């Protein structure tokens, strides 16, 4: 079962003004709580939308539906996806494990605890938070320090906010589904 293909179908239906009803047999397999993000990229790998549900508060089938619709139509960095663009984009879905707070005595320990290619991160301080998926530092060629710094930026905080003991760092893992 390719979740990226289901995400595409959800968006295709929405562009027709319809609600895609995920088949019951698929819903049954995806009826456990999990976070999910949908990433939409152009065929030349430019980001076109990426949004999702970071925490396991909905059944996966519902997180998938929400994330697909948000990535296509609500990502504030991009205009809503248009029907004409469908042939020129690819969908990717990342299913997230529950985020786990990293406990450190010194913020520099984050550099050892975060595993590039395995962990995604959530940076939180006060009302601010930013999430980066596990595949992002690989795609961008970042080390752990750059990953943390860009996580801070994503949260709308200074790039070195991860060095502040008041900043919380969470890690999660992701299972990635891509279109063929």
UniProtKB/Swiss-Prot annotation:
Pfam family, one: AMMECR1
Residue span(s) of domain AMMECR1: 1-180
Origin: domain of life: Archaea
Protein name: Protein NEQ441
NCBIfam families assigned to the protein according to its UniProt record, in alphabetical order: AmmeMemoSam_A, TIGR00296 family protein
Species of origin: Nanoarchaeum equitans (strain Kin4-M)
InterPro entries assigned to the protein according to its UniProt record, in alphabetical order: AMMECR1, AMMECR1_dom_sf, AMMECR1_domain, AMMECR1_N, AmmeMemoSam_A, Uncharacterised_MJ0810
């Amino acid at each position: 079962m390719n979740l990226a293909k289901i995400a595409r179908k959800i968006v295709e239906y929405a562009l027709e003004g319809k609600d895609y009803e995920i088949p019951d047999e698929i819903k049954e397999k995806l009826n456990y709580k999990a976070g999910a993000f949908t990433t939409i990229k152009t065929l030349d790998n430019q980001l076109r939308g990426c949004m999702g549900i970071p925490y396991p508060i909905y059944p996966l089938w519902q997180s998938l539906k929400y994330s697909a619709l948000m990535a296509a139509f609500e990502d504030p960095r991009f205009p809503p996806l248009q029907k004409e663009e469908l042939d020129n984009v690819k969908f990717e879905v990342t299913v997230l494990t529950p985020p786990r707070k990293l406990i450190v005595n010194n913020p520099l320990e984050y550099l050892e605890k975060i595993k590039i290619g395995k962990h995604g991160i959530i940076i939180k301080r006060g009302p601010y938070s930013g999430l980066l998926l596990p595949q992002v530092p690989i795609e961008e060629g970042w080390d752990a320090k750059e990953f943390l710094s860009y996580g801070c930026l994503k949260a709308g905080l200074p790039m070195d906010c991860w060095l502040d003991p008041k900043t919380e760092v969470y890690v999660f893992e992701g299972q990635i589904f891509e279109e063929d």
